[in-house]
């Protein structure tokens, strides 16, 4: 609809421009500028209607042109006061808006013509150029200059722009000012025509009317003022004829206007029907567009649903495969579950068995603890007894020292025995009897009783430790008796002594023949001494740092001290648990309980020494050996070990 309006406006503007050009060609000598301005400002930009009751005071061409342009108006509005309320055909979208007047429609059309790109702004220079082209005025026109100042109040020049709202407001004010100025000019023209008109003539001179009209539009009359009355009368008849002719033409024009009004009414009805049809068509088009959009949406939805269906089908196939795989896994898991249940039953049975074994082991452990407590009591008793024996040993050592001192005295006496052997023999016999009486009579018996008690205690006490080797005693091997020496040569006999560095001097430097009676006690003494040494060496090596479950090795008679450092083998039946009941510091090395052997006292028998002296000396040496014997091995530093339960 906008394009139709723009095309109709442009066609009408072109028609008017052609009519203006025709007027210029028809009346070149009758002020074409004034006629053209009056026609344009009246019909296009300034639709000022003529006053009611007034007469048409324009030339014939101007009247015809004005009537021709008035045919565009609806019926009853051509040249009337309702011309400015003429309504152009509005688009369907603008039917709800208030109806625009002819002035607003013309202004909108002018702005749209200057703004073909629909930017909403137009330069002032472009608008002025368009108005100059339409009106035919130049930039020197006062009214156009006033309009330019109104559109460009800040004097920006060629870069000034104006919007539609500003353009409409400024143009309305400018048109009102031009209409006011035009009304004053028409009042002056009417007064001038009344002065020239004759009361007997129906009309005045057409030249005077034309001059007045031209003056009202700013034109000038070049003819000389005050023509002769004769000439006026001669032209009066011509004017009357032309008036009649114009009246006939006016009647024809009235009939054509009526016909045009009827046609306009029919066209209005057709336009209304077309508008209704256009409205229904637009509604149907909108419905069709909506349906088309819905159809496109449905197509898109259908495509998406198809894609979802395909994806769901693929997912269903994949899910079915997974279900089959899961079913196989479930069967496998069921089989494994059955196996695990069987294993669980076996484990339960094994747990019950282990619980039974655990209870038995607990009972054994309690029994072992009870036995260990008893053994600890026995060991403490033995430790106290060992301490008492150690004190007794110290007393014996003191006595041994005294005896050594006495022996040294005897050696001195023996050195002097050459002078008085008889007296020496008697003194030695008396000293022997006194020494024997001084010795404790039950020393040997006490030692034997102590050994027997230890053997009975070790045999009577049941050991709580499983797989423990018992203490062993090595029986002394009998040694062959030494053969008696046939020759009475001086013999050297070694006797044990406390001090290894001390060397005894010979008792007699002269050889003395030994008698058979005196040789036999010496042999018995040497044999008993060897047996005692073997017994002492046969004691088991005790390692305080080793547990009670280890194997103990006996010390052979001919073995050295290094042989006692033998690594014991652990019994594999039970694992010992360490519990130190006696807080005793243990050394990291193994220790051997070996008998303390005192170095022997070398005595050289002189053949001149009498037999009683030798017997006395042998008796003294025997007593020294008895006193210097080491006590049997005890367990003062024995550590106790509990047993761990066997591994499952």
UniProtKB/Swiss-Prot annotation:
GO molecular function, one term: identical protein binding
Subcellular location: Nucleus outer membrane; Nucleus; Chromosome, Telomere; Nucleus envelope
Residue stretches spanning the membrane: 607-627
Traits of the deletion mutant: Male and female Kash5-null mice are infertile. Testes from Kash5-null mice have a reduced size compared to those derived from wild-type animal, have a normal tissue organization, but the seminiferous tubules are narrower and present a great decrease in germ cells. No spermatids and mature sperm are observed, indicating spermatocyte arrest.
InterPro entries: KASH5, KASH5_coiled-coil, KASH5_EF-hand-like_dom
Topological domains, Cytoplasmic: 1-606
GO terms, biological process: actin filament organization; chromosome localization to nuclear envelope involved in homologous chromosome segregation; double-strand break repair via homologous recombination; homologous chromosome pairing at meiosis; meiotic telomere clustering; oogenesis; spermatogenesis; spindle assembly
Protein topology in the membrane: Single-pass type IV membrane protein
Cellular component GO terms held in the UniProt record: chromosome, telomeric region; lateral element; meiotic nuclear membrane microtubule tethering complex; meiotic spindle pole; nuclear outer membrane
Tissue expression: Restricted to the testis and the early ootidogenesis ovary. Expressed in spermatocytes and oocytes (at protein level).
Amino acid composition bias (Acidic residues), ranges on this chain: 473-497
Coiled-coil regions listed: 230-420
Chain segments carrying region Disordered: 206-228, 473-545
Perinuclear space side: 628-648
A Pfam cross-reference name: EF-hand_9
Keywords assigned by UniProt, alphabetized: Chromosome, Coiled coil, Meiosis, Membrane, Nucleus, Telomere, Transmembrane, Transmembrane helix
Assembly mode: Core component the LINC complex which is composed of inner nuclear membrane SUN domain-containing proteins coupled to outer nuclear membrane KASH domain-containing nesprins. SUN and KASH domain-containing proteins seem to bind each other promiscuously; however, differentially expression of LINC complex constituents is giving rise to specific assemblies. At least SUN1/2-containing core LINC complexes are proposed to be hexameric composed of three protomers of each KASH and SUN domain-containing protein.
Comment, domains: The C-terminal 22 AA is required and sufficient for localization to telomeres at the nuclear envelope.
Function: As a component of the LINC (LInker of Nucleoskeleton and Cytoskeleton) complex, involved in the connection between the nuclear lamina and the cytoskeleton. The nucleocytoplasmic interactions established by the LINC complex play an important role in the transmission of mechanical forces across the nuclear envelope and in nuclear movement and positioning. Required for telomere attachment to nuclear envelope in the prophase of meiosis and for rapid telomere prophase movements implicating a SUN1/2:KASH5 LINC complex in which SUN1 and SUN2 seem to act at least partial redundantly.
Protein name (Swiss-Prot/TrEMBL): Protein KASH5
Natural source organism: Mus musculus
């Amino acid at each position: 609809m906008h394009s139709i309006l723009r095309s109709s406006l442009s066609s009408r503007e072109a028609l008017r421009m052609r009519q203006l050009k025709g007027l210029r060609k028809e009346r070149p000598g009758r002020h074409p500028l004034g006629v053209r301005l009056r026609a344009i400002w009246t019909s296009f930009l300034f639709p000022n209607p003529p006053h009611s009751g007034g007469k048409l005071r324009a030339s014939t061409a101007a009247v015809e042109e004005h009537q021709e342009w008035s045919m565009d108006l609806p019926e009853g509005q051509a040249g009337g006061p309702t011309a400015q309320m003429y309504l152009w055909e509005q688009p369907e979208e603008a039917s709800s808006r208030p109806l625009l007047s002819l002035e607003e429609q013309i202004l909108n059309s002018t702005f749209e013509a200057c703004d073909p790109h629909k930017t909403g702004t137009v330069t002032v220079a472009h608008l002025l150029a368009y108005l100059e082209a339409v009106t035919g005025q130049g930039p020197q026109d006062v009214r156009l200059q006033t309009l330019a100042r109104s559109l460009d109040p800040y004097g920006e020049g060629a870069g000034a722009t104006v919007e539609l709202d500003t353009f409409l407001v400024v143009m309305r004010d400018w048109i009102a000012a031009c209409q006011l100025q035009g009304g004053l000019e028409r009042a002056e023209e009417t007064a001038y025509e009344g002065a020239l008109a004759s009361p007997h003539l129906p009309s005045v001179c057409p030249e005077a009317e034309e001059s007045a009209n031209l003056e009202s539009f700013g034109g000038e009359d070049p003819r000389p003022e005050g023509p002769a009355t004769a000439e006026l009368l001669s032209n009066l008849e011509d004017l009357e004829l032309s008036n009649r002719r114009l009246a006939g033409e006016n009647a024809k024009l009235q009939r054509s206007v009526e016909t045009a009004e009827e046609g306009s009414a029919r066209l209005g009805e057709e336009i209304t029907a077309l508008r209704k049809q256009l409205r229904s068509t637009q509604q149907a088009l909108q419905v069709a567009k909506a349906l088309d959009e819905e159809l496109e949406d449905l197509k898109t939805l259908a495509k998406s649903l198809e894609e979802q269906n395909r994806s769901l089908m693929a997912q269903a196939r994949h899910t079915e495969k997974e279900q089959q795989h899961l079913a196989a896994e479930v069967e496998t898991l069921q089989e494994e579950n059955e196996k695990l249940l069987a294993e669980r039953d076996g484990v339960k049975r094994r747990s019950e068995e282990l619980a039974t074994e655990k209870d038995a082991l607990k009972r054994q452990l309690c029994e072992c603890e009870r036995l260990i407590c008893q053994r600890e009591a026995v060991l403490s008793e033995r430790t106290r007894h060992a301490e008492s024996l150690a004190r007794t040993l110290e007393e014996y050592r003191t006595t041994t020292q005294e005896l050594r001192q006495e022996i040294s005295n005897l050696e001195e006496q023996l050195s002097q025995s050459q002078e008085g052997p008889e007296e020496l023999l008697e003194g030695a016999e008396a000293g022997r009897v006194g020494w024997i009486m001084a010795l404790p009579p039950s020393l040997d018996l006490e030692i034997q009783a102590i050994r027997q008690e230890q053997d009975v205690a070790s045999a009577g006490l049941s050991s709580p430790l499983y797989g423990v080797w018992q203490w062993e005693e090595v029986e002394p091997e009998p040694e062959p008796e030494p053969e008696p020496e046939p020759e009475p040569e001086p013999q050297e006999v070694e006797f044990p002594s406390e001090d290894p560095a001390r060397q005894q001097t010979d008792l007699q430097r002269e050889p003395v023949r030994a008698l058979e009676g005196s040789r036999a006690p010496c042999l018995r003494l040497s044999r008993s001494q060897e047996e005692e040494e073997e017994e002492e060496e046969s004691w088991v090596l005790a390692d305080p740092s080793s547990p009670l479950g280890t194997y103990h090795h006996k010390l052979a008679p001919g073995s050295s001290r290094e042989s006692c450092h033998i690594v014991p083998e652990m019994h594999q039946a039970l694992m010992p648990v360490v519990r130190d009941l006696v807080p005793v510091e243990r050394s990291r090395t193994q220790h051997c309980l070996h008998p303390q052997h005192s170095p022997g006292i070398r005595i050289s028998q002189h053949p001149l020494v009498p037999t009683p002296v030798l017997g006395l000396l042998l008796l003294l040496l025997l007593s020294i050996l008895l006193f210097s014997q080491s006590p049997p091995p005890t367990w003062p530093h024995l550590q106790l070990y509990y047993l761990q339960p066997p591994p499952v």
